[in-house]
């Protein structure tokens, strides 16, 4: 199997990607197994940050690398929290603190103006200097609820309303969430690309 490094410290993401990429003959290894140092996400877009993370992991391990950058874009807040979704309430903020800050920012905003979407950009770099990395973008439309619902998922899932299923993202079963979510859509694109252009 061909080793590929996943540029994340999130073990949940590592397990999910390992299962999905095994079908393509990949052995997914977390960057933590190589003691890859943290890299500053200095980009101003999801794409830039995903490329920064993938390039850094490829450089430090000598392997092909996959990175994702994702976040929530709220129209009423001119796109915030955006690339700062994980640290919206501060550098070391918890999911709960980020969620509460967003609910406060959206207090009193009418339902019609609560539109939002999750974005996920996945980047696969064959090596550190790959001039044409594979870039896949998934988007999930919904709106911001006025209070949290459900216990599944993480991040902003409890306050993200999913019109297709008339519930919060945190109320979806994991299999259903994968079908609808921004990350699920980006992964589908990645797999379609890998079928057409297998990594050698």
UniProtKB/Swiss-Prot annotation:
Keywords of the record: Hydrolase, Magnesium, Metal-binding, Nucleotide metabolism, Nucleotide-binding
Coiled coil spans: none
Signal peptide bounds: none
SUPFAM superfamilies, per the entry: ITPase-like
Catalytic activity, reaction form: XTP + H2O = XMP + diphosphate + H(+); dITP + H2O = dIMP + diphosphate + H(+); ITP + H2O = IMP + diphosphate + H(+)
Protein EC: 3.6.1.66
GO biological process entries: nucleotide metabolic process; purine nucleoside triphosphate catabolic process
A Pfam family recorded for this sequence: Ham1p_like
Top-level enzyme category: hydrolase
Annotated substrate binding sites: 8-13, 70, 154-157, 177, 182-183
UniProt record similarity statement: Belongs to the HAM1 NTPase family.
NCBIfam families in UniProt: PRK14822.1 (NF011397), RdgB/HAM1 family non-canonical purine NTP pyrophosphatase (TIGR00042)
Known partners and oligomeric status: Homodimer.
Role summary: Pyrophosphatase that catalyzes the hydrolysis of nucleoside triphosphates to their monophosphate derivatives, with a high preference for the non-canonical purine nucleotides XTP (xanthosine triphosphate), dITP (deoxyinosine triphosphate) and ITP. Seems to function as a house-cleaning enzyme that removes non-canonical purine nucleotides from the nucleotide pool, thus preventing their incorporation into DNA/RNA and avoiding chromosomal lesions.
The protein's name in its UniProt record: dITP/XTP pyrophosphatase
